Amino acid sequence: MTQHDTIFSKPLPSISDFCFDQQVVEVFPDMINRSVPGYSSILQTLPQIVSRYVQPNSHLYDLGCSLGAATLAIRKGCEQTENCKIIGIDNSQPMIERAQLHLDGFKSQIPVELHCQDLAETEIKNASVVVLNFTLQFISQDKRDEVIQNIFNGMNKGGALLVAEKVRHPDESMNDLLIELHHNFKRANGYSELEISQKRAAIENVMKVDTLQAHQQRFQKAGFQHSSVWFQCFNFAAMLAVK
């Protein structure tokens, strides 16, 4: 059973950089649903998009798979396609171990492999669908072009890249507004001012967000022919790029 997120509910003498450790694993489903507007809508829509782009005899990747919620959505989207394999990657061993338990609870004929490794070092091959669900924002900005290029190089023609991210608006006044609307969303979901401020302090050094334009330029630079935002709520957006 998912535990309630209280990690930042009490004053901390010092705030360490946020990391996906065992403490976060225990509360992650509650944390992400109360923190990311539209998260459930993105997961619910993933199978529909995956089903349009999955190819027989191909691989589907969930890069930064955390507890496997998107992995399950990907699997649902390829149920009618022959000989597919899903590969989930995460650099947090506690996340991978819990994801395996989660996936084992939902049996399927579609094989899923989970690997604990750095996605920047993951070989992508024979891919029809690759998902980065709130993952790229935690990768060093100087490595993001290389990550997307690596995905493109290992993707089959007609394949799809699905990227969901927190984004920054280029207009500072609009960006401030979207941040405040996001904080209101968290307040409405029970987070206190202390929790919001301490979480922000913990995450500001490890999560660097790009503008939508930067993402689209990165897709184009890698070689993707088409890209579009397919969902946005406040400063959280989901994008699709097609090879």
From Swiss-Prot:
Q: Mind listing the GO biological process terms from this record?
A: tRNA wobble uridine modification
**Keyword presence, Magnesium:** no
**GO terms assigned for molecular function:** carboxyl- or carbamoyltransferase activity; S-adenosyl-L-methionine binding
Reaction(s) catalysed by this chain, per the record, are: prephenate + S-adenosyl-L-methionine = carboxy-S-adenosyl-L-methionine + 3-phenylpyruvate + H2O
InterPro entries (UniProt xref): CmoA, Methyltransf_25, SAM-dependent_MTases_sf
Q: Which domain of life is it from?
A: Bacteria
Give one Pfam family: Methyltransf_25
Keyword check for Mitochondrion: no
Known EC number = 2.1.3.-
Family classification: Belongs to the class I-like SAM-binding methyltransferase superfamily. Cx-SAM synthase family.
HAMAP family per the UniProt record, alphabetical: Cx_SAM_synthase (MF_01589)
* Function description: Catalyzes the conversion of S-adenosyl-L-methionine (SAM) to carboxy-S-adenosyl-L-methionine (Cx-SAM).
Subunit:
Homodimer.
What is the protein's name according to its record?
A: Carboxy-S-adenosyl-L-methionine synthase
